[in-house]
Amino acid sequence: MVTVFDRYFGYHILSGMLESIPCQPSDNYCTVAKCSGHCRCNAACVVINFNTVTGVCQLHDASVLNNNATVEGNVTDWVILEPQNGAPKFGEWTVVFRATAGINQPALEEYMNSTRRDDQYTIVNNVPAGCLSLNGSIPCDRHYRTRHLETWDHWGVSQVLLGLYKDGDMVGNVTFDCNGCSFTSWFHYNHVIASSWNDLTAPNTTYNIFGIEGYRTRHFVINDVYGGCPNDQGWLMVVDQTGGDGCPWENGTSSFPYILTTRTGTRTNWTYGNPVVVDVMAIMVKL
């Protein structure tokens, strides 16, 4: 089966060449299909250069979408082929990040980790099935991360959906407008256009923290009040370290991340409001 590619006609990538394979007509090497076969057999290969005239096949370990890649244009004989990503899709939404609760890996650290590409076709078959699902009862050993976070501007993201799941059921969500935003700036109250939390977009609603970096070990925070631990209240909190910042409501488990959200359609008191501990936080984009 031929791998499906994103194709960039008239371009030739110069960075990170692994191998250049000349055309051998007698062995039927002068096809894109054969060239893609070489790439599939090389775990480091992420991009193919193919010369449509000579049939030369070049394998590279640098994505055409990386900012540090060197690419020449207006070369009519060449085409760059990058295998399309294997990120899961749910309707019109594509998953770009899936935080898994309780695996003792900080969610924010992996979100910002530019070396992680779980959707790369050379490794996607080794990703546990649970990581491609929104159901936390199916085992997943990582925070699933795709190349979309590094190539955000290229994809033209229009909206972002943050979904929170417990045993496969969505228990909370926020939709953000993302025209002109980056992979970090979308998470801001000015971009919110819809939410399952009725008071999140109310005219009189205020936030003491609304941001991915949050506060100390609390990340992906949408919070209303820090008034001393018993008075803290908000909508979303990802505690990225055992024990968090020391409040009793952060100590519900010995493992992290500890992902908390409100059980109702409004903000909750983290101590007395009986918040939901979710097992999956998914960040999805509409392209």
Residue ranges of model-derived segments:
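Mature extracellular or lumenal effector domains of secreted proteins
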Residues: 84-287
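Extracellular disulfide-rich cysteine clusters
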Residues: 1-88
